[in-house]
């Protein structure tokens, strides 16, 4: 198989067949669910790569037994990435050509997968309440602010989170020493252990851990 998932490794150049790949993926996902005779209550889609799932679910699969009561939610992690493709790729979807219009799948004469997901989903979520508000503005809406404003009553911002009953430094059995708000000594022991493990040369410096892209958007500047 090829290296890379969405684009050529070491570049920002997308694979030329991305539209075909993710059309196949979206339809294939629903086909598998149908063949397994699973009757899902909710299908959760993420970003443009699954944007056509809500479209298929509400059109080609709407009358199928296993999907009649299924709801679908589309999560937008980063509105910059929308899955724009040429008009001719509409033919690959197998969807009715009439859906290629400004209300549904068309976006400045291109096919827009994420727009389809937003329009056809029952609910839309994104990574925070603030971002949910921002993407309804011209400054951050990436051209889809009108569509998102129209769906504002179905748009929710949900923060990423953790289970504090498991990831709790006061009780966690996987760290060198436990600590909490009233007992911070264990935190220093954990820091020293981390520095020894990874051979970090500077001892008297702050250590910050972040799971994120190295991008200005994340506030790293």
What does each of the following model-derived ranges do?
Residues 1-221:
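Catalytic cores of nucleotide-sugar-dependent glycosyltransferases that transfer UDP/GDP/TDP-activated
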